[in-house]
Design a protein with these regions (language model features):
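Glycan-recognition and catalytic cores of secretory/periplasmic carbohydrate-active enzymes
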Residues: 1-347
Length: 347
């Protein structure tokens, strides 16, 4: 969040920064193999946080290290961030998914923000160009996937990749990146959302721009409200309003936030993996959805006059995530920070 030094450090309420640093630095060499182009197969007793550098989550660990370095100034964290960011360098040439947006923005985007270098900037611009190559002007969207039964699939997650285009538009003073991002957001706003402001996961388009189908790939069913999908939506439209000041995007962000806050079934506000999943002790929760939502709502709270309600809800989420129920102990949880996330339950 811009001017974040002015915000209360709610994440420190019940949150142990020393733990965060120790957990992130705990034997990170065991993550190295994850960031090879072709990692070795899983072995019992080893950990991998993604399947390869081309996995959609590959930029998250480097991004964690960059943020931890920003918060603490610990040089060891910076050195780790640089090393794990550099592993992703081949991704700048990859065009096979929309996820190159936050794969590279989480890693190289934070690298340029905190340790700028010409090679880092070049990698970001090249990645943004590759992401733009997936944009179809007739459809008005960036294609998400190159697999599956769909003609031109666009998933709500794609809203998270737009920040790379906004960032590179600022870096280059070239509006084409921003223009594509905003057109994608407009098309998604038109076709992804139901009357209650919940989102479909997948909308696929025909070549003429008409909708082929609306369905899910990771939610409970085609008409359900997948928790992380709603988090992607509120985060993405908050970013789009920040960059455009288009009030339609702001209203959408607020509407999704209201949906999330009113439909959550759990006392601690950490959502079940799908808002339409049965409310039972056996139903998995999704701490990752809560984390994305908290980040979005903190920023949203700074963009509106009535922002306290969003900040308070984000703080509630962060307090829950910082509790023993979700925050792992050092040396546990295979080195990961949070417990009880749900990746893709139907798959």
């Amino acid at each position: 969040v811009g001017d974040s030094v002015l915000l209360p450090r709610s994440i420190w309420t019940g949150y142990d920064m020393d733990f965060l640093c120790r957990q992130l630095q705990r034997d990170p060499a065991t993550f190295k193999d994850s960031l090879r182009i072709k990692p070795v197969k899983d072995a019992i007793g080893t950990r991998r946080y993604c399947s390869s550098i081309y996995d959609w989550t590959s930029g998250f660990f480097p991004g964690n290290l960059w943020y931890a370095y920003q918060l603490t100034g610990i040089e060891g964290l910076k050195n780790g961030a640089v090393k794990f960011t550099n592993y992703l360098y081949p991704v700048k040439d990859y065009k096979g998914t929309h996820d190159i947006g936050f794969m590279m923005n989480c890693s190289y985007g934070n690298a340029y923000r905190l340790a700028p270098a010409d090679s880092v900037r070049q990698a970001l611009v090249q990645t943004a160009d590759n992401l733009c190559s997936r944009f179809d002007p007739t459809i008005g969207s960036i294609r998400s996937w190159d697999f599956g039964k769909w003609n031109f699939p666009v998933i709500i997650d794609n809203m998270m990749n737009l920040d790379l285009l906004f960032y590179v538009s600022h870096l280059t003073n070239d509006s084409k990146y921003k223009d594509i991002a905003l057109k994608h957001a407009e098309t998604t706003l038109k076709n992804h959302f139901r009357t209650d402001h919940s989102s479909y996961h997948v909308v696929s388009y025909n070549n003429d721009g008409s909708v082929e189908m609306k369905c899910t790939h990771q939610g409970k069913n085609d008409d359900s409200s997948w928790a992380r999908g709603q988090a992607w939506g509120v985060y993405g439209y908050t970013s789009c309003y920040r960059e455009s000041k288009d009030t339609a995007f702001l209203q959408q962000a607020k509407d999704i936030a209201t949906l999330i806050m009113t439909r959550v079934k759990t006392e601690d506000a950490i959502p079940l993996w799908d808002y339409d999943a049965p409310d039972s002790p056996e139903t998995p929760r999704d701490a990752s959805a809560a984390s994305v939502t908290a980040s979005a709502l903190i920023e949203l709270s700074t963009l509106v006059e009535d922002g306290q309600v969003y900040f308070d809800y984000a703080e509630k989420l962060l307090k829950s995530l910082s509790s023993d129920a979700y925050l792992a102990k050092v040396g546990t949880n295979q080195g990961f920070i949070l417990m009880h996330s749900t990746g893709s339950l139907p798959n």
